[in-house]
């Protein structure tokens, strides 16, 4: 069944919409979703939240077996400090884990929203490196829990991973870190509340939308399942469909965040990305390769008070590649 699913995902003759239609109700997906549904959510365990549970909870972070929430949260925090460098294949600077080195400048938080498998990490990682920021990602907390079981237990640990990531975020705020927060962004009220909370803690908050065709995101989600064993229930993915963009547009209309950025993640990691909007120089001075059409229409503000992107020459009406070192 998985081999057949892989053929669909890899078929160059099918567009994302056609692949999406064939993937839905595929036997391999139906079977995996059934297995997921049979697992008990960890937040429903009889002793969840008890003193004993908190003190004896098992974690595995970066190959280290840990016991207790205190150790687990501290190790997840350290992982969030290093994550961007490790995923980008960069050496981790010494000061990244040096707690005596405090953030002396303006505190920045970037909330990066987009559907599952939208390629948020391709944007979040360079932004985290730019700002020496801690990435707080519930998906990283999921991996640390034994019930995750390589991915099939993603739903079972979903609730607990959110609790853990909130604790990691609170720790990072307490330590004055800059933050990058990848989220789906399916609920406007939750993102609005998050922005206000961060601003109340002295952060300048930028909201970033990773924009992608919903069918392509769905295909990538199932491709990730084949490669890594991680699966998001189809019904849940459908429930998120189109919601991050609604959230972005609504909050931009309200003007609640301090800056807004919208970037297309249709292309793969390392390939040039199309910027549709950047009101605060969010994507400037990062390792993200950007591209821009000359008939772009001014989506990047020219009066934003920061240097314009360095543009390399290109054909008159074609794409102009913007390289940001």
Residue ranges, per PLM feature:
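Conserved nucleotide-sensing/catalytic segment adjacent to the nucleotide-binding pocket
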Residues: 133-135, 140-196
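The conserved Walker
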Residues: 116
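Conserved GTP-binding G-domain of TRAFAC-class P-loop NTPases and closely related GTPase folds
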Residues: 219-325
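Hydrophobic positions on the alpha1 helix immediately C-terminal to the Walker A/P-loop
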Residues: 123
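Conserved glycine(s) of the Walker
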Residues: 119
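Phosphate-binding P-loop
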Residues: 100-106, 172-173
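Conserved phosphate-donor/acceptor-positioning beta-strand/loop module used by diverse small-molecule
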Residues: 201-221
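N-terminal pre-Walker A segment at the start of P-loop NTPase domains
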Residues: 62-99
């Amino acid at each position: 069944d998985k081999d057949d699913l892989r053929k669909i995902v890899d078929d160059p003759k099918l567009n994302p919409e056609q692949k999406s239609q064939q993937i839905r109700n595929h036997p391999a997906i139906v079977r995996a979703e059934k297995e997921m549904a049979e697992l008990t959510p960890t937040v429903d365990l009889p002793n969840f939240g008890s003193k004993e549970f908190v003190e004896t909870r098992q974690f595995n972070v970066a190959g280290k077996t840990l016991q207790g929430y205190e150790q687990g949260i501290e190790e997840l925090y350290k992982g969030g400090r290093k994550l961007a460098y490790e995923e980008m294949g960069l050496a981790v600077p010494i000061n990244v884990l040096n707690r005596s080195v405090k953030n002396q400048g303006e505190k920045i938080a970037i909330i990066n929203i987009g559907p599952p498998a939208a390629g948020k990490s391709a944007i979040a990682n360079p932004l985290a490196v730019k700002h020496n920021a801690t990435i707080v990602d519930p998906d990283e907390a999921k991996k640390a829990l034994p019930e995750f079981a390589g991915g099939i237990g993603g739903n079972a640990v979903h609730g607990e991973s959110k609790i853990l990531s909130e604790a990691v975020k609170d720790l990072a705020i307490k330590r004055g870190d800059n933050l990058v927060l990848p989220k789906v962004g399916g609920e406007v009220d939750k993102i609005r509340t998050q922005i206000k909370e961060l601003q109340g803690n002295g952060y300048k908050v930028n909201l970033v939308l990773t924009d992608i065709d919903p069918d392509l995101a769905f295909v990538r989600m199932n491709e990730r399942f084949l490669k890594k064993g991680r699966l998001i229930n189809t019904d849940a993915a459908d429930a998120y469909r189109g919601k991050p963009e609604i959230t972005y547009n609504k909050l931009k209309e309200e003007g609640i965040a301090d800056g807004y950025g919208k970037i297309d993640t249709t292309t793969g990691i390392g390939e040039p990305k199309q910027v549709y909007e950047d009101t605060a120089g969010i994507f400037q001075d990062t390792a993200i390769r950007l591209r821009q059409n000359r008939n772009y229409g001014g989506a990047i503000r020219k009066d934003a008070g920061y240097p314009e992107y360095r543009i390399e020459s290109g054909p008159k009406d074609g794409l102009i590649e913007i390289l940001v070192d």
